[in-house]
Amino acid sequence: MPLPRQPLSLKARALGYLSRREHSRVELRRKLVPHAESAEEVDALLDWLEGENWLSNTRFAESMVHRRAGRYGTARLMQELKTHQLGEETLGEVKAQLQSTEAVRAKALWEKRFGRPPADLAERAKQVRYMMARGFSRSVVSRIIAGADELLEDGDMSD
């Protein structure tokens, strides 16, 4: 008969979460509190993890941006990052990085999803809605679709 499993210690549970992916301090705290005897115990563990550099809000932000930047715009990613209560300095750095690459990321997503200029106003509106729902700015979306329209017009002239 197999022996019953010992419950994981709080530290083992935290390291298990961190071994799978980066977590923000707020997110890891939320996951650990139900398994702890007190909130102070969790805070002490989180302080220790940060001291050992096993928990880092900066690394979490970089990881999240790396995972999701190809599918979402700056506005959407910043909204998600703000829910993790990262520092203003970290958020500012991430926002600057995202804004510098937003046009390239938006163009790549647009080409993957649509690949051709809109044929009429209804299709144009659909493309704009799709891109804006993913957090890309109106100006970037307009430039990409306008650029696609110009490519279509240039193609018509060469025929």
UniProtKB/Swiss-Prot annotation:
The record's InterPro entries line, in alphabetical order, gives:
RecX_HTH_1st, RecX_HTH_2nd, RecX_HTH_3rd, Regulatory_RecX, WH-like_DNA-bd_sf
Give compartment(s): Cytoplasm
Q: Which domain of life is it from?
A: Bacteria
Where does the protein principally reside?
cytoplasm
Which BP terms does GO give this entry? regulation of DNA repair
Q: Which Gene3D superfamilies match?
A: Winged helix-like DNA-binding domain superfamily/Winged helix DNA-binding domain (1.10.10.10)
Task: Name the keywords, alphabetized.
Answer: Cytoplasm
Keyword Cytoplasm (UniProt): yes
Q: Name one Pfam family in it.
A: RecX_HTH1
Q: Does the keyword Ubl conjugation apply?
A: no
Query: For this UniProt entry, what's an example GO CC term?
Result: cytoplasm
State what this protein does: Modulates RecA activity.
**Family per similarity comment:** Belongs to the RecX family.
Protein name, entry field: Regulatory protein RecX
Which organism encodes this protein? Ralstonia pickettii (strain 12J)
Q: What is the lineage of its organism?
A: Bacteria, Pseudomonadati, Pseudomonadota, Betaproteobacteria, Burkholderiales
